[in-house]
């Protein structure tokens, strides 16, 4: 979905369309009814349109005209953000930002990476050769495996103390939703490392990308990443 200033909430969630033949209204699903939704340049759309994602990202459902409809399972939203044109973008609502598990800054490719990109684009567009790498069943199985990874009481307390530190040292710290996201991300990392349990290294590796975007600081040069780094330096596993 290309997010633009004139995009409406119904353009995302769907709307009721009148069927002249049957003289009834039929619901036409919006693009949010998919397993993976890519919101391109999400901050170019006004907050009212962005709010259409809140219920979907939290409850895997959307409500239109008083009717609630479930979304496909699995359901995931991936968004890109335009940071180049600040005068033509909107600030993302805190409630929306908090629903994203991670924020990853890609930056520019280095020389070798850019040369490789140019080589891949010299012929046919890579999208023409895209092949599935996993089925829906594979994703559900992976999600179940990650959910079974053990996060001990010590690890959970470590995550909680990191979150509390951010709340005490920022205008707006990490929410309980952020703590839960950090535990889940740490479980996923442990699974990728071939372990059935989380270790502090998992938490420390995931914390910057999971917590930083949720934190708001006072003006003065520091940002969420600085607060997270400070928390990791000061808080020890007990």
Question: Residues of each region from the PLM?
Answer:
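Residue-level signature of catalytic and energy-coupling elements of molecular machines
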Residues: 12, 53, 100, 159, ...
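AAA+/P-loop NTPase substrate/partner-engagement loops
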Residues: 1-21
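C-terminal engagement/docking regions of AAA+ P-loop ATPases
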Residues: 168-238
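Walker B catalytic acidic pair
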Residues: 40-41, 52
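Non-catalytic accessory segments flanking P-loop/AAA+ NTPase cores
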Residues: 1-3, 11, 58, 111-113, ...
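Conserved alpha-helical scaffold flanking the Walker A/P-loop in AAA+ ATPase domains
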Residues: 18-38
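Conserved AAA+ ATPase small/helical "lid" subdomain
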Residues: 129-179
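Canonical AAA+ ATPase core
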Residues: 19-24, 44-49, 57-133, 140-149, ...
């Amino acid at each position: 979905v290309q997010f633009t200033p004139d995009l409406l909430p119904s353009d995302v969630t769907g709307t009721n369309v009148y069927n002249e033949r049957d003289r009834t209204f039929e619901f036409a699903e919006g693009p949010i009814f998919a397993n993976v939704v890519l919101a391109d340049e999400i901050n170019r759309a006004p907050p009212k349109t962005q709010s259409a994602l809140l219920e979907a990202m939290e409850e895997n459902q959307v409500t239109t005209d008083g009717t609630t409809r479930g979304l496909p399972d699995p359901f995931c939203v991936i968004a890109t953000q335009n940071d180049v044109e600040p005068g033509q973008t909107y600030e993302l609502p805190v409630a929306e930002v908090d629903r994203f598990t991670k924020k990853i800054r890609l930056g520019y490719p280095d020389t070798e990476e850019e040369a490789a990109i140019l080589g891949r684009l010299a012929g046919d567009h890579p999208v023409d050769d895209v092949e599935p790498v996993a089925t829906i069943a594979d994703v559900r199985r992976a999600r179940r495996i990650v959910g079974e990874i053990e996060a001990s009481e010590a690890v959970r307390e470590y995550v909680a103390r990191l979150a509390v530190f951010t709340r005490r040292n920022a205008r707006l710290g990490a929410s309980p939703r952020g703590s839960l996201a950090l535990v889940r991300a740490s479980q996923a990392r442990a699974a990728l490392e071939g372990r059935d349990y989380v270790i502090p290294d998992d938490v420390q590796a995931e914390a910057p990308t999971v917590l930083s975007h949720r934190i708001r600081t006072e003006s003065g040069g520091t940002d969420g990443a600085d607060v997270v780094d400070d928390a990791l330096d000061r808080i020890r596993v007990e």
